[in-house]
């Protein structure tokens, strides 16, 4: 994240699935690097306080941008309870809108981005794992909604908000573009657009490849290590 110079990172369900030993360490590493690790819908069961940061404010070309991040609201159903001991995952509705309103009132951002590790869904309003369309259809005062979890690379445009699915495995990058007309410090008009950009593997960043060569080899060695022998037939078909 530091190498990529990310402005913020939102936690996914797999981060929590790995347990406190992993995501607590990740949060501390991000903190040392000055990168906000966001999951505003995770609260402690002992005192009701938020476990991770909800959002951050960054400046881009003189424009104040609010970035709010959330993990999947249905995490508890996706992993063993020991992985999230002492924590509770809140629904993104109406929480995200409440947070957006609070951020806009306190920080007065000119652009608002919500990053949520939730599937797009069908807008059925009753599926905690798939709240993307529910958010898109209800959020006010948000320019971009970035979704994940279902590996979709869809782009859905509305009059005042655009949903960008981030895809999977680094195969696609969601690119959002916004044009602002600012007068006297106030935005008088804005144009939103977005697209999903495919990554071409024949154009590899060799500098990054060299920078992470040791880490790549360590993971490769671990992944290829022998754990045991299976003597019975296995079926790879999904049920």
PLM regions: where:
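Acidic, metal/ion-coordinating pockets
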Residues: 1-201
């Amino acid at each position: 994240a530091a190498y990529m110079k990310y402005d913020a990172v939102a936690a996914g369900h797999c981060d929590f699935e790995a347990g406190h030993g992993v995501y607590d360490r990740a949060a501390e590493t991000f903190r040392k690097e000055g990168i906000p690790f966001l999951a505003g819908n995770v609260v402690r069961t002992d005192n009701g306080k938020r476990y991770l940061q909800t959002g951050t404010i960054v400046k881009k070309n003189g424009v104040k941008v609010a970035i709010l991040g959330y993990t999947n609201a249905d995490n508890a159903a996706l992993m063993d309870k020991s992985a999230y001991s002492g924590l509770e995952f809140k629904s993104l509705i109406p929480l995200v809108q409440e947070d957006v309103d609070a951020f806009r009132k306190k920080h007065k951002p000119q652009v608002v981005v919500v990053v949520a590790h939730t599937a797009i869904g069908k807008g059925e309003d009753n599926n905690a794992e798939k709240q993307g369309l529910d958010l898109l259809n209800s959020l006010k005062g948000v320019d971009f909604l970035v979704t994940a979890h279902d590996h979709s690379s869809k782009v859905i445009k509305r009059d005042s908000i655009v949903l960008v699915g981030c895809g999977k495995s680094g195969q696609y990058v969601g690119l959002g573009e916004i044009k602002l007309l600012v007068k006297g410090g106030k935005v008088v008009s804005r144009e939103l657009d977005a697209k999903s950009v495919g990554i071409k593997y024949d154009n590899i960043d060799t500098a990054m490849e060299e920078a992470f060569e040791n880490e790549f080899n360590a993971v490769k060695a671990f992944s290829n290590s022998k754990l045991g022998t299976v003597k019975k037939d296995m079926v790879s078909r999904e049920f």
